[in-house]
Amino acid sequence: MSANFNVSPSPHIRDRVKSSNIMLFVVIALLPATFFGIYNFRHENAWLLVLVTTASAVLAEYIYEKLMHKPVTIQDFSAVVTGLLLALNLPPTLPLWMGALGSVFAIIVVKQLFGGLGQNFMNPALGARCFLLISFTGKMTYFVYDGVTGPTPLAN
């Protein structure tokens, strides 16, 4: 009883739904959490951090694929998802250049050097968060949110 197996890279199961549609749905699903986070923190840097991490992730993917003479895949929205997830994982007081550096690391080192979409060994946004946490521990861990402290309202 011998079977012929065809060994090929993933994905092994295919569907009519394209990965670009799935990534777009993920972006749409993340938008309410993003807007609530920006509103909740009320920090002037929060929306800029989202914009910078997302734009630098898309730009890093575009530049890398152009330099390596690969087909440009920014239309699949995976870089947008990575930039958005990274922004949601970072403290809102983080300098914008660190967010951009994290996005570039996520796209080039964690995603593209391992083969691109679906071939990476870990989530690029979380890999970038680990990189930033190891590289800039003070900025990544020191975040003080102004809170209201005092006795309960019944004590008044």
Question: Where are the regions that the model predicts?
Answer:
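Alpha-helical transmembrane segments in multi-pass membrane proteins
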Residues: 25-33, 49-61, 78-83, 87, ...
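Transmembrane helix interruption/hinge and helix-loop junction motifs
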Residues: 40-46, 90-99
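Charge-biased, low-complexity intrinsically disordered regions
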Residues: 66-67, 71, 85-86, 90, ...
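Cytoplasmic-side transmembrane-helix entry/capping segments in multi-pass membrane proteins
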Residues: 72-82, 98-104, 119-129
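Long hydrophobic alpha-helical segments that form multi-pass transmembrane helix bundles
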Residues: 118-156
